[in-house]
Amino acid sequence: MDHLPQLVAEARAAIESAEDVQSLDEVRVRYLGKKGEITALLKGLGKLPAEERPKAGEQINDAKQVLSDELEARKKHLQDAELNARLAQERIDVTLPGRGEPTGGLHPVTRTLERIESLFAHIGFDVAVGPELEDDYHNFEALNIPAHHPARGMADTFYFDASRLLRTHTSPVQVRTMKEQAPPIRIVCPGRVYRSDSDLTHTPMFHQVEGLLVDEDVSFADLKGTIEDFLKAFFERESLSVRFRPSYFPFTEPSAEVDIQCVMCGGDGCRVCSHSGWLEVMGCGMVHPEVFRHSGIDAERYTGFAFGMGAERLTMLRYGVNDLRLFFENDLRFLRQFG
C-alpha cells in the first residue's frame, strides 16, 4: 500500500505521454486491467490486518477512479486531435466551383414545334389541339373527302374499325374548332399524326402543324403574306425566296405547294434539293366551301385559308439532318447536339 501514490504518479505520467489511442489503451491495461498493477493491490487486501482493509480499499478505488477519469479525458483529447488532423488533410475548398449535374434538353422536333407556335402567337394565332384517335367523319368526310374519294389513297391509314382510326393529319382539329367557335378564328394545330410509311424521309408517326384563319374578306394574298413572313422568320433569312405552285388538296380551293430556296446550297443546286435549287416545305390554300358547310360556317359571308407543314421536315432543313429516322432512335450522341 505504501507504493500506491508512486503507482498513481507513474500511471498519470504514462497517460499524459500517450501519443495515440492504442498507446493509451496499453497504459490502461498495465495499471487497471485484470492483471494491472493497481488491480493487484485490491487482490492483496487480504494480507492486511482487518482494521486496515476498509481504508486501504477506499484509497485503491479512489486511485482507480482518478486514473479512469484521466484515461477517458486523454482518450477524448487524442480522438479529437486525430479527427482534426484527418479533416485538415481532407479539407474542402468551398470557393471551388461545384460539379454541375448533367441536364437534359429539348428534343429538336419539340424545339421546332415551340418555335412555330411562338412565331404564330406573335401574329395573334392560338394553339388548338384534338384527339389522335379520330373518327372517319372528322378525318375525312368533313374535310371534303367522302367515302371512295380518290384522295383517300393519299394516306395509308391505321384503322381500328370501320369508323375509328389514327388521324392522318391535324386538320380534324380545325373542323372541331370551327364547330365550337364562331369567326374570326386564328389557330395553329400541332400534334402527332400517323401514316403507314417508313423510309429515309417518312416515319409511321410524325408531327404536323396545321393552321387556319377564318374571317370576312380573307384572300389568297393574306395567305401568301402570312406564309412568306413565317418562313423568313423561321429560317432567320429575310432574303429567303419563297414560291407557290398550284396543287390539289380536297379541303382547299385554290391550293398550292410552298417551296423555299434551298437552305443548303442557296439555290445553286445540290443533292438535298435534287439540284433544283428549291425545297418543298408545306401545302396551303383557301378553305373549301364544303368544309365550311360541314363546320356550320356561312361560306357566303366568311372566307379563310389553311396550311400544313411537317415539323420533322422543317427540323431537318433547319439543322441539316439528312435522315428523318434519327429523330426517333433516341441516340443521345445525336440528341446532345441540340441541347
From Swiss-Prot:
- Which EC class is the enzyme in? ligase
Q: What Gene Ontology biological process does one annotation of this record name? A: phenylalanyl-tRNA aminoacylation
What is the top-level taxon of the source organism? Bacteria
Which CDD domains does the entry link to? PheRS_alpha_core
Please state the span of the N-terminal signal peptide per the UniProt entry.
none
Q: Which Gene3D superfamilies match?
A: Bira Bifunctional Protein, Domain 2
Q: Under the GO molecular function aspect, what terms does this record hold?
A: ATP binding; magnesium ion binding; phenylalanine-tRNA ligase activity; tRNA binding
Q: Does the keyword Ligase apply?
A: yes
Compartments where found: Cytoplasm
Which reaction does this chain catalyze?
tRNA(Phe) + L-phenylalanine + ATP = L-phenylalanyl-tRNA(Phe) + AMP + diphosphate + H(+)
User: For this protein, what does the record note about how its cofactor is bound?
Assistant: Binds 2 magnesium ions per tetramer.
Q: Which UniProt keywords apply?
A: Aminoacyl-tRNA synthetase, ATP-binding, Cytoplasm, Ligase, Magnesium, Metal-binding, Nucleotide-binding, Protein biosynthesis
What cofactor is this protein dependent on? Mg(2+)
Q: Name one GO cellular component term.
A: cytoplasm
Any idea which positions bind Mg(2+)? E253
Q: For this protein, what is the EC number?
A: 6.1.1.20
SUPFAM superfamilies assigned to the protein according to its UniProt record, in alphabetical order: Class II aaRS and biotin synthetases, tRNA-binding arm
| Quaternary structure, from the entry | Tetramer of two alpha and two beta subunits.
Q: Which family does it belong to?
A: Belongs to the class-II aminoacyl-tRNA synthetase family. Phe-tRNA synthetase alpha subunit type 1 subfamily.
What name does this protein carry?
Answer: Phenylalanine--tRNA ligase alpha subunit
Q: Which organism is it from?
A: Chromohalobacter salexigens (strain ATCC BAA-138 / DSM 3043 / CIP 106854 / NCIMB 13768 / 1H11)
Q: Which gene encodes it?
A: pheS
